[in-house]
Design a protein with these regions (language model features):
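Solvent-exposed loop/turn elements at secondary-structure boundaries
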Residues: 2-194, 306-326, 330
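Gram-negative outer-membrane beta-barrel transporters
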Residues: 128-290
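C-terminal beta-signal and adjacent terminal beta-strands/loops
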Residues: 23, 122, 135-136, 140-143, ...
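Residue-level signature of outer-membrane beta-barrel architecture
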Residues: 1-5, 19, 117, 211, ...
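Hydrophobic, lipid-facing positions within transmembrane beta-strands of outer-membrane proteins
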Residues: 1, 109-113, 203-207, 262-268, ...
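Membrane-spanning beta-strand positions in outer-membrane beta-barrel proteins
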Residues: 2, 10-12, 112, 124-128, ...
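Membrane-embedded beta-strand positions of outer-membrane beta-barrel proteins
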Residues: 13-15, 115, 127, 209, ...
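Short sequence motifs at beta-strands and strand-loop junctions characteristic
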Residues: 101-107, 188, 196-201, 256-261, ...
Length: 398
């Protein structure tokens, strides 16, 4: 909906509202996920300690249970992560209530309210507020275990000046299943609302300025500030298994509310009269991504709080020492330039251009080492912005 506030075409208010559903494709519960072949266990993991140091697992890998063959020259292998592996038994069962009917697919609502104002002829500013919220989350409940079958424990972060607050803080919200129930899997997938409230909200404010000045000059620039807040603490209270990630690490952070992050973007383009040469450039300043401090805590250390070794003979528990959004990478600033000339020959038209990427030769860091070791290489750069380079191009129309 758009409304001309004063009827002079200079001030408008625009409101948009939409609901978007998760695609009903092959990767959803309406597709391959409910295929019987997708519901049985076709892969598992298990721990292995190379006791004899010959770089091969000297265990009976066909035996799904834990083995300690170190006294006979073999190795130590933990129990497989899913005892249903290679059996004609479903590990995943879907709630019939989410497979039939309407209004059940995961969705997100999106609302935007914008005000556009003409400041001068061919110069306008647009200010908008945007909110996006998600719903119909799915939860996985392992019916083979209860919440009381998980034992909570804590981990004390190492003291390190690179960590928020210098480290030394106690991280709670960690769980380990009763060892006698490890590997027993009977997952029931249903709506998360059956266990409690789960939320995910995005809020942002954007300001954009557009100027189309005479004689071929165009200027555009703007800023956007926003953040995503998520909370599934009520779900974790009922389903401690929700703290385990797909990679096997632990995620104790059920409420994540990072700071608002701001980015800036702009462009300018100008066509030089008579010589018909176009000069343009783009600039962007983007906040660095969220970083983790992934620490592998030995089972002996965990046992000090847990009261026993980790289930499944796991040698360590992996978790991030920092709350998502509390540690960010360096801001990435980049300037790109382009010069283009149009040549005309009879009925042919040739566009010759030179592009200069990363004109300021910024070495902004793009990825970091996120494995934490005290006095180690945590946050060492692993990838930086590509160095400044030029590209020559030509396009012929005839």
């Amino acid at each position: 909906v758009a409304y001309d506030v004063f009827g002079n075409g200079k001030t408008s208010v625009k409101v948009n509202l939409g609901k978007y559903l998760a695609a009903a494709d092959g990767s959803s519960i309406t597709g391959a996920l409910t295929n019987p072949l997708s519901r049985i266990s076709t892969s598992v993991t298990r721990t292995w300690t190379d006791t004899n140091k010959n770089f091969k697992p000297d265990c009976d890998l066909s035996n799904p249970l834990a083995q300690n063959l170190s006294t006979s020259g073999g190795d130590v292998c933990g129990q497989i992560s899913n005892l249903n592996f290679a059996k004609p038994v479903f590990s995943n069962t879907y709630d019939p209530a989410i497979l039939h009917g309407s209004g059940l697919r995961p969705y997100d609502w999106n609302i935007g309210v914008q005000v556009q104002q003409q400041l001068l002829p061919r110069v306008s500013v647009n200010v908008g507020y945007f909110r996006r919220w998600f719903g119909n989350f799915l939860a996985t409940d392992n019916l083979s275990v209860k919440a009381s079958d998980y034992t909570p424990f804590t981990v004390t972060a190492p003291a390190d000046p690179r960590l928020p607050g210098g480290g030394g803080n106690v991280i709670s919200g960690l769980y380990d299943v009763n060892p006698t129930l490890f590997g027993q899997t009977n997952n029931f997938i249903t709506l998360a609302d059956n266990y409690g409230s789960q939320t995910s909200h995005w809020n942002s404010v954007e300001v954009n300025l557009t100027a189309r000045v005479r004689q071929g000059l165009t200027l555009q620039g703007g800023t956007s500030t926003g953040r995503l807040t998520t909370d599934n603490c009520a779900i974790v209270a009922q389903l401690p298994e929700a703290t385990f990630t797909a990679t096997g690490s632990l995620n104790p952070y059920c409420h994540v509310e990072p700071p608002f992050l701001t980015q800036f973007k702009g462009l300018a383009a100008y066509t030089i009269p008579k010589v018909d040469v176009q000069v343009s450039g783009t600039m962007q300043s983007i906040p660095g991504g969220t970083l983790q401090a992934n620490l592998s805590v030995p089972t002996a250390t965990v046992a000090q709080s847990l009261g026993r070794p980790l289930a499944g003979s796991a040698p360590f528990a992996t978790l991030s020492l920092v709350t998502p959004g509390s540690v960010l990478g360096d801001r990435v600033n980049q300037l790109d330039l382009r010069v283009q000339k149009v040549l005309r020959f009879s009925r042919a038209r040739v566009q010759v251009g030179v592009d200069l990427y990363n004109a300021l030769n910024s070495s902004a860091i793009q990825t970091y080492n996120q494995t934490f070791i005290t006095n180690g290489n945590w946050l060492t750069p692993t990838l930086i912005l590509p160095a400044r380079f030029a590209k020559i191009s030509a396009q012929v129309d005839f």
